[in-house]
Amino acid sequence: MTKEGMLSAAGRRFSRCAPSPRPRRNYALANIPPPAAVHIRTNDMISPEERRFLEAAELGNKPTLQECLDYDGDRRLNVNCLDSMGRTALEIAVDNENMEVVELLLQQPDIRIGNALLCAIREGVYRLVEVLVNHPNITREMLGDGWSQALDPSEAASAEYSSDISPVILAAQLNQFEILQMLIRKDASIEKPHRHSCICETCDRERLNDSLQYSLKRINTFRALASPAWMSLTSPDPILSAFKLSWDLQRLAFEEHEFKETYLQLSEQCKQYSCDLLSQCRSSEEVIAILNKDGNVNDDNIDVWASKLSLSRLKLAIKYEQKAFVSHPHCQQLLTSIWYEGIPYRQRSGTWANFFLYAFLLFLWPIFCLMYILMPKSRLGRLVRSPFMKFFYYSVSFATFLGLLTWATFEDYRYEKGERGGMTRASDRGPPATWVESLVFTWVIGMLWSEIKQLWEEGFKRYMRQWWNWLDFLMICLYLCTISIRLSAYYIFTYREDPYRYTVRTYWTSEEPMLVAEALFAVGNVFSFARIIYLFQTNPYLGPLQISLGCMLVDVAKFCFIFVLIISSFSIGLAQLYWYYDPNTDVCLPGATCKHSSNVFSSIADSYLTLLWSLFSITKPEDTDVVENHKITQWVGQGMFIMYHCTSIIVLLNMLIAMMSHSFQIINDHADLEWKFHRTKLWMAHFDEGSSLPPPFNIIVTPKSLIYVMNCLFNTVRWLLGKYTYQKNRNRATIRRPGYSRKRNEMEKSGGHDDDSLKPLTYADIITRLVARFIHQTKKDMKMDGVNEDDLHEIKQDISSLRYELRDDRRREIVRSSSHIDAVKRDIMRTMSTTSRRPYGGSMRLPKTRPSVAEESEEDDKSDETSSTDEEADETRSRKSSVLYIPPVNSTLPGIISEEAPVKKSTKRRASEADSKLPDRPLSDTYTSSFTPKLLPVFAQPPHSALRKTDTSMSFPINGTALDTSIVKPPRGVLRASQENLPAVELIETLKKEMNEKLDRLISGISENVKSPSPASHSHVGFNVEK
């Protein structure tokens, strides 16, 4: 079938098809390609002039670039043209770090700089950024918040950076310290975004306009604010700024779930920055200044040398959960020094020495406490007041309390006689307290007073943030309820005659006060023994396990929420299925004996208990059977019971195990960090002064307490009279500084602060040092990263640009040297012809048909400048007209091209370093084998011949004899020989003879080169031979 027939058949089939609601064009039949889905700019869309312009910018070819900019054709070149990747020539030059090309492009009036400035900041070249920022097109507003409004629409659609990334934001994100500091000096700033729930007009407009763009703008801004460079250069207190910003970002991670990982990464970046600053501390004084800073008081210039510490910054770090900062070795070293203050040899002692020390302190515990009550300011009192001793004696006191609870639990009441003979104590409905219970009551009162003091000192919010305080609160409440009920029962049955006071417990009701009190006491004992786990945090082996247990309890709580939903659904379903079958009645079937029903799902409460105990295999499978012949009920009940077991045991319990394993693995991976953080929280509770005595000694009224009470009453009276103001700041300095006495003695012996190491330090001075060290360390780490792909690309671009520069310099040097030597040769020949015509006496003025040597050189330079673009023509001309000039051995001609020629500025190049070498041919007899070609100077200014017409005389000696100006005084432009000066005429004759010999040799050499040409002579410089 022919092509026309196939097309007609296809057309008929197409016409029989059902009409489409949206007709489509058949590109296959029309042989027309479908339109492109994505329009990508290719090299075919770029004009030849623009392509040449962009390639010159890419390769660093400055002459070609200048030629493209100077070209004035039919259509002016667009300096903002784009390549296939959407980059302008300025962006390409900045990306290649070609400063000369950038300066050349910036001279153009309509150049666009926007994205090029961002590229320069990305490359981190300070000089490029400085040149671009100082351009008139860049204003102060464009560097900060006004960047997106000032951008050109074509630049705003850049494929690399969005319009909301300003130069200062990009410099901060990349941690370019020098560039960011330069932008800050030009008043560039970053505005912190509003909170996520802000309902202002600006936020609502941006959110409704484009919610994604609004969120990305916030993230880019927070990336800049969270950068170490921005916080180091703009914040007076970088550590406090890092704490607050980290906390805000952590809250945003749970508010904007879509970008949770991004915000968490930025939060970790802020935490790491604060740790890096703390790592720069080099002495304990600097660490103390950092940890003792109070963010609520402007005390940057207050002396950090103080006998008391508050550790306000450390408390703030614990509040903001800066675990890495708190667990830092510098911080832990200071805390350890404070913790063991007064017991300096404890850390360096062995195991047995510490054991005997603890035993000694244990047995002297009551004596030390009583001595502290009597003499709180003595040396022994200071020892008892130390943090370690307070914790140790609190642990001893709590262990004693647990021992009393155990004793009270195992006390046998059933065989003790009551107040009335014949009745046991167990049957007394209002028994009095025993001496063990009285001691427990005393301990509970002491623990209650300790918690009240802690609540007063820390504040309600800080007290409630610690979960162990919740446990203490519940434990004390249970014991107080037990004591209250016991006292009430004793009062009721002691002061009121009741014949049923001594009754066997079998006849007691469930609401009996003693039964309620014993139940509460039992629960309180459970919490009391669980409280001892809190003390494990000081141990490096048990501490991580205790922390893992706390995380697992959170997982159990999550599991219980899901498990309650599952067990409730099955309990309600089974109760609905078995509600009719009462387990308390016997069922009698016809022709069978009566059977007792064992229905365990008759109510919702029974269903809950049955399903709960079934997890531990206590229930039986027969519990779903019924006595009646109701198979459908029995089958459905068995199916639901099986589904419950599969869901709860196979799925939920294994999920709980996996969750607990995951939590334990997280803690185990960061065991040291988590343990040190929680240990620090325990230590901080014992650092502050107060609560020095453990229960029950803390309820004893001491003389110090009486003085404090009287002082408080006196201040209250003064406050009522308006003569006293209470300070609301709770972060008062109460912690003793380790080694302060020794340091103070050293300062007194040194006679003041002459020594720099003993001078008082302020927080502002120390934070300035730390920031400077951090910046230096960061830059050092960046330099040690090694060579990457970008560095290799930059080296390649530098080599390419240098190659073009060397090629241009070489071409100019060849043309300039050739023209200069030709002019020298013509001057010499003109001089010889003049002297041959009038050898004796008189003078003859030559017709000035050619310019002088200097003028010829200047004209040659001008011609070189105009013809520099045509490289091949210059090389061809130099190849045809140049030979290497080698002077003879016995020649006394001055060093026209020698190294000793006086020049102002020259760049020397050996003739042998040209593109090709000399041809291997034998030299003439007049040449010597030890001869080395002279270096050819490149004159910075228009060159002049060493042998030239001057206003005075010849500037070189001839045969070792210099011409005196008194002998030869030619006028300007004329070579004169006087008849009276015969020695001068003889010298000219000698010069003429030597020149003739030299020309003969040159002609012979040129003839040999013509007969056997070699490519190696193309780059040699010599006299041009005119045929």
Curated annotation (Swiss-Prot):
Membrane-related topology note: Multi-pass membrane protein
GO BP of this protein: calcium ion transmembrane transport; regulation of cytosolic calcium ion concentration; single fertilization
Subcellular location: Membrane
Region annotation (Disordered) ranges: 1-22, 825-929, 1008-1027
Transmembrane regions: 355-375, 391-411, 473-493, 516-536, 559-579, 640-660
A single GO cellular-component term on record: plasma membrane
InterPro entries in the cross-refs: Ankyrin_rpt, Ankyrin_rpt-contain_sf, Ion_trans_dom, TRP_dom, TRPC_channel
Keyword vocabulary terms for this entry: ANK repeat, Ion channel, Ion transport, Membrane, Repeat, Transmembrane, Transmembrane helix, Transport
UniProt keyword Transport present: yes
PANTHER family tied to this protein: TRANSIENT RECEPTOR POTENTIAL CHANNEL (PTHR10117), TRANSIENT-RECEPTOR-POTENTIAL-LIKE PROTEIN (PTHR10117:SF80)
Name the UniProt record assigns to this protein: Transient-receptor-potential-like protein
Source species of the chain: Caenorhabditis elegans
Taxonomy of the source species: Eukaryota, Metazoa, Ecdysozoa, Nematoda, Chromadorea
Gene name of the encoded protein: trp-1
